[in-house]
Amino acid sequence: MSASLKRTPLADAHVAAGARMVDFGGWDMPLAYGSQLEEHHAVRRDAGMFDVSHMLNVDVTGPDATAFLRRLVANDVARLTVPGKALYSCMLNPQGGIIDDLIVYFFAADQWRVVVNAATADKDVAWMQRVAAAGSYDVAIAPRRDLAMVAVQGPNARARVWAARPAWQAATEPLTPFVAAQVADDTLVARTGYTGEDGFEIVLPADQVVALWNDLLAQGVRPCGLGARDTLRLEAGMNLYGQDMDELTQPDQAGLTWTVSLKDPERRFVGRDALEQFAAPRGFVGLKLQERGVMRAHMAVYTPLGEGEITSGTMSPTLGVSVAFARVPQGVQPGQTVEVDIRGKRVPALVCKLPFVRHGKAVEHS
């Protein structure tokens, strides 16, 4: 391990479990603990858990917190009125490019939380502070590096969490997707995830996370690394920041139009002017390879309307074929066949709506 890499509170537990550690956005993180394939299937069929403590929880509080977040993110947080409810959004630059994708939690009009990606965390906090200062918003922006985070995912994930922490069941069993409950001081359980499966993401004080991890292990929850996390999120049609979108990519070029709210003409969020003036020349689609081979990022895609490029690709453990996301010319439609350049050979691929897998089952594409 490089001395410059950051470590989560679970780093020693990963090494003790035999994890292969890699640099992920400046963090020393587990790639896999053995078989990446078995970890993937554990989440689809039973329950797996991921250390996501490298992601940053940021508390946004103060009298102007709601107005500030309505300016900061492209989705409209005013939709959130039930404490614990969350939404997914992008934070844009003035050109409409994506600074980061994130989840926003509402607790009260003056009390919110934003969860941002690890590799962009410092940049995100600096941008939030800049937007707050520019608009003279009366808000406090507090990064919470004292917290850790574990995602427990799979059809049996919730039951395993309740077995490990019975006291949490009453507050968390009624939760619907994208809703969180506070179960103890600084302990939040949200029915969210990045796999396409049911489960919880649990935020808790860093000094309590090793005990939770060990108790979940004792309940048979399988530790999973970044490798399985990537194949799971790809099957589920979920973007990865820095891979499928970045500051040069607008939401509609990354299949994220649904995360942008233009309903309130008075809400001038950062990047709105650019989005209203610019029609994206490229769309975002799923691809399913029709022959043997594996699609990977940056491979060329040939369509009747011009050339595109794969942003993420893998072999799908659930489907047994290669799947990918691609940025292609607008007008390329699901059901059409395109060609992918794999080592100089053009291989046919079916254009698909996302996701490829929903709740462990293949989504039919034709």
Curated annotation (Swiss-Prot):
One annotated GO molecular function: transaminase activity
Entries under PANTHER family matching the protein: AMINOMETHYLTRANSFERASE, AMINOMETHYLTRANSFERASE, MITOCHONDRIAL
InterPro entries: GCS_T, GCS_T_bac, GCST_C, GCV_T_N, GcvT/YgfZ/DmdA, GcvT/YgfZ_C, TrmE/GcvT_dom1
NCBIfam families hit by this protein: gcvT, PRK00389.1
GO biological process, one term: glycine decarboxylation via glycine cleavage system
Keyword terms of this UniProt record: Aminotransferase, Transferase
Phylogenetic classification of the source organism: Bacteria, Pseudomonadati, Pseudomonadota, Betaproteobacteria, Burkholderiales
Function description: The glycine cleavage system catalyzes the degradation of glycine.
Pfam annotation, one family: GCV_T
Family, per entry: Belongs to the GcvT family.
Protein's name according to its UniProt entry: Aminomethyltransferase
